[in-house]
A protein has these predicted regions:
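Long, low-complexity, charged/polar intrinsically disordered regions in eukaryotic proteins
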Residues: 1-43
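Short amphipathic alpha-helical interaction segments
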Residues: 28-29, 56-61, 74-100
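Mixed-charge, low-complexity interaction segments
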Residues: 39-47, 51, 85-123
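Short acidic, hydrophobic short linear motifs in intrinsically disordered regions
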Residues: 44-76
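Short, amphipathic alpha-helical interaction segments positioned at domain boundaries
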Residues: 101, 106-163
């Protein structure tokens, strides 16, 4: 199980999800949520992930159930909002996971919103461990900047001198 969690973190980082500033626990939960959205169970291969094109979309509570059942968590079903706000926030911002995949126009607090792996990211994820992995990661980044680079970008703001009397 730990090996798959480590691989999930490698994949997320390669796809531009920043993880270095997260606690180890937050990184592990993000990896488990990511694998749950992908429909992975221990022992499965990355080639077996499911994405939005497969119509595999999970609600927050379904993600919790999957994490509890297959990834050794003990998360209350009442913690569904934490999944969205904490565990899936960065992968969603990085466009690795699509939120509201079931209904793109759903409100943020709509209980019917489903999460799914972005098909563009799924093409890359399925190549993890193969010879074409690095090339597919590079192709993925040609189409979009990484979230990590976007968040770390230096802002050049015009500054106005202020004098306090």
């Amino acid at each position: 199980m730990q090996n798959m969690i480590n691989e999930a973190l490698i994949i997320l980082e390669a796809l531009g999800v920043p993880t270095s500033d997260l606690t180890n626990r937050r990184r592990i939960k993000m990896a488990k949520a990511f694998m749950s959205v992908a429909g992975l169970k221990p022992g499965m291969r990355w080639t077996q992930i499911k994405d939005n094109d497969d119509e595999h979309r999970l609600l927050s509570r379904q993600i919790i159930t999957h994490m509890n059942t297959y990834w050794g968590e003990d998360i209350s079903s009442g913690s569904y909002d934490d999944i969205r706000r904490k565990d899936l926030a960065l992968p969603v911002e990085a466009l690795v996971i699509l939120n509201s995949a079931k209904n793109p126009n759903a409100n943020t607090n709509d209980g019917t919103r489903g999460f799914a792996i972005n098909p563009a990211a799924a093409k890359v994820i399925r190549k993890y461990g193969d010879a074409g992995w690095q090339q597919s990661v590079q192709e993925f980044h040609r189409e979009r900047p990484t979230l990590a680079s976007t968040l770390s970008r230096v802002r050049n703001l015009a500054r106005v001198p202020v004098q306090i009397n």
